[in-house]
Regions:
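Alpha-helical transmembrane segments and their immediate juxtamembrane cytosolic regions
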Residues: 2-432
Length: 432
């Protein structure tokens, strides 16, 4: 009897140690809630994150490791794989915030929920800000005062924006659902136009220069306009996800799958219809739309018998059609994963591996940048493929060892969990 009690205590202790590793997706995937209806896990969310992170690693390493003769594959591949990129993670981040708020608001004070989200978002933004320090500023931000600390910390890279998304989603959720949809669509439609107007006026008045600095930033991977629109749209889907999960039935999951699937198809179709025209670097400004450079890279080859005449606008990140297109694919990918992972219960070795990768995706994302420096433009494609799978497997193994045997101490997921615990502890101290 005493051995059984000891084993149970040990299991509880281990579960407590590793629970912080799920902090970024805790709202959707946590089992530790007193409401029996919420005990069902959506493993598909972690599956999507895991699939996305290994494809992001593929894109990043192909850019860094493929030799000059084969680098055109990066330009072609990344244009198609961008559907697994920032937009998917931003949507998942917003969904997790919504679910976390809705699930905990009846048992945890509003102040604690708010502080957890704020601290977590700020922590991710700080990590992203340090990445900005390693990126040199180009004109017009290579001069004083933009080229000195702390302004060099500012830039909308994926981590910086993801942290901001956590915070923004909390406040956006307070708006009426219909208002959110309207605002989100309006931002998608006028955001890129407004950003272009501000950019082309930066030489006329310092106000436009500073507006462009904050809206587009010296690191315009995900400029505030129009990307903030995803927060308004995704919180709407987050509330529906919570509603269906709260019912806790297979029929509810099927309805969730259908809504996400149909919505995804509609968004994708809208993006393609709006953005079917082709662009080149002569028809669209590379300073505003950096990913048009993928076309230049794709055409820099001697193997194919033709040159791509242009890049469809819906492939060019941050255009109106691109936001619709990427948002649609994010919803479609999530819906398909819900169907196969949660409804059909497909849990093979590969799926379980991706689910684990999803739980440690932030750590893998950060480590990815270090592996990129191991080699520089030296691999033909066949050797790159072997090396890529080796690196992905090794990173997964190392993260598994780190998580199981070292409790994930020091990982970003562990840090996020500790930050949330601090916020909760602070509230308890104030109560006493």
């Amino acid at each position: 009897m005493s051995n059984t009690i000891t084993d149970k205590n040990q299991i509880k202790s281990e579960e407590k140690d590793v629970s912080s590793l799920r902090s970024l997706s805790e709202g959707i995937t946590s089992d530790n809630d007193n409401n029996p209806k919420l005990k069902r896990r959506l493993n598909s969310i972690d599956f999507v994150k895991g699939l996305a992170i290994i494809l992001i690693i593929l894109s990043h390493l192909s850019d860094a490791w493929l030799n000059s003769e084969w680098r055109f594959l990066f330009g072609i591949g990344t244009a198609f794989l961008d559907i697994f990129g920032p937009s998917l993670f931003i949507l998942l981040s917003a969904l997790s915030v919504v679910f976390s708020i809705k699930k905990k608001k009846e048992t945890i004070p509003e102040k604690v929920i708010r502080n957890k989200i704020l601290f977590r978002g700020i922590a991710i933004m700080i990590i992203g800000a340090f990445f900005n320090l390693s990126i040199p500023h180009n004109p017009p931000y290579d001069v004083f005062p933009f080229n000195i600390f702390p302004l060099t910390l500012w830039g909308w890279n994926i981590l910086f924006f993801m942290g901001f998304t956590q915070i923004a989603s909390y406040f956006i959720l307070k708006l009426n659902i219909n208002v959110r949809i309207v605002i989100g669509v309006i931002i998608i439609l006028i955001g890129p136009i407004l950003r272009e107007i501000i950019f082309y006026e930066i030489d006329t008045h310092p106000v436009f220069l500073w507006l462009n600095f904050f809206i587009t930033s010296p690191v315009p991977q995900l400029p505030f306009l129009p990307w903030i629109s995803i927060c308004f749209i995704s919180t709407t889907f987050g509330e529906y996800l919570f509603k269906m999960m709260n019912q806790g039935t297979e029929d509810a999951l099927i309805r969730l799958y259908k809504v996400f699937f149909i919505s995804g198809i509609l968004f994708i179709t809208s993006g393609i219809i709006i953005g079917f025209r082709l662009h080149t670097t002569s028809t669209i400004d590379i300073n505003l739309y950096e990913t048009i450079d993928w076309l230049t890279i794709a055409n820099n080859q001697n193997f194919l018998q033709f040159q791509f005449p242009g890049m469809p606008e819906f492939f060019i990140r941050s255009t109106i059609s691109n936001i619709f297109y990427l948002l649609g694919w994010a919803l479609l990918i999530i819906s398909i994963s819900i169907y196969y992972i949660d409804i059909k219960g497909k849990k093979g070795i590969f799926n379980r591996m991706l689910i684990f990768y999803g739980k440690v995706s932030l750590s893998l994302f950060l480590i990815m940048f270090l592996t990129g420096y191991l080699f520089t433009e030296g691999f033909p494609p066949w050797f790159f493929v072997i090396t890529y799978f080796g690196v992905v497997g090794l990173l997964g193994f190392l993260m598994y060892v780190w998580t199981i045997y070292f409790k994930g101490i020091g990982t970003p997921e562990w840090i996020m969990g500790k930050i949330g615990a601090i916020a909760h502890k602070k509230n308890n101290v104030e109560k006493n």
